[in-house]
Amino acid sequence: MIRKDAKRSALVLFSGGQDSATCLAWALERYETVETLGFDYGQRHRVELECREGFRNAVVRAFPAWADRLGEDHMIDLSVLGAISDTAMTREIEIEATANGLPNTFVPGRNLMFMTIAAAIAYRRGLQVLVGGMCETDFSGYPDCRDDTMKALQVALNLGMDTRFLLETPLMWLDKADTWRLAHELGGAELVELVRVETHTCYLGERAELHAWGFGCGECPACRLRKRGYEAYLAGENVTEPV
């Protein structure tokens, strides 16, 4: 059962990927008005960003009740983040572990910047809730995806803007199988199919072949995690071991 809070409005960090798409559905089921926010920070491909409009349009067609709640979409040019980053998310380099144990897909400061800009937009537009797809269960060790980070950031943003934002991370303690299950709980098989077909997770931007779990190369860490989570969801299992 999803608790509804119809008097509140939310801004969802929406990249066009599976996690943020599920968070968007979660917010649409919960809040009266929901706006979306994406960032172009010089990613190595634009496939995920290009999925954003298609998923939003598909949700409007498939779920009329949500269509009335879905508000404006915002796209922010954050190319400065790509300019100061040297990662596999912003450069054509092999995906591998670095000396500190983190994969080189980690973009330092990314979620901190995303949430800070989201808060500034929400402040201007009178939105009370910020929603992000950060997760500490199925993740690669990114420090800016941790629950402690998000809680500390909520405090800092509220102090710095003298407001009472609520930072919601509905996937924080879910594995990928649970994320597929949440989509089913929110919108049934139709939403699961929209997430499968209309979103993109692959680090390499491969969208030539539609697999059972969605589009992707099938080999990068993001694809393997998505694939394994989908298979576990179909089998009714949990997936908590690292890929």
From Swiss-Prot:
Q: Which Pfam families did the record assign?
A: QueC
- Which positions in this protein are listed as binding ATP? 14-24
Provide the residue positions that the database annotates as binding Zn(2+): 202, 217, 220, 223
Quote the record's cofactor note: Binds 1 zinc ion per subunit.
Disulfide linkages recorded for this protein, renumbered to the chain, are none
Please give the pathway this protein is involved in. Purine metabolism; 7-cyano-7-deazaguanine biosynthesis
EC number in record: 6.3.4.20
So what does this thing catalyse? 7-carboxy-7-deazaguanine + NH4(+) + ATP = 7-cyano-7-deazaguanine + ADP + phosphate + H2O + H(+)
Reply yes or no: does the keyword Transcription regulation apply: no
- Entry keyword set: ATP-binding, Ligase, Metal-binding, Nucleotide-binding, Queuosine biosynthesis, Zinc
Q: NCBIfam families annotated for this entry?
A: 7-cyano-7-deazaguanine synthase QueC
Q: What is this protein called?
A: 7-cyano-7-deazaguanine synthase
In which organism is this protein found? Paraburkholderia xenovorans (strain LB400)
Specify the taxonomic lineage: Bacteria, Pseudomonadati, Pseudomonadota, Betaproteobacteria, Burkholderiales
Gene that specifies this protein: queC
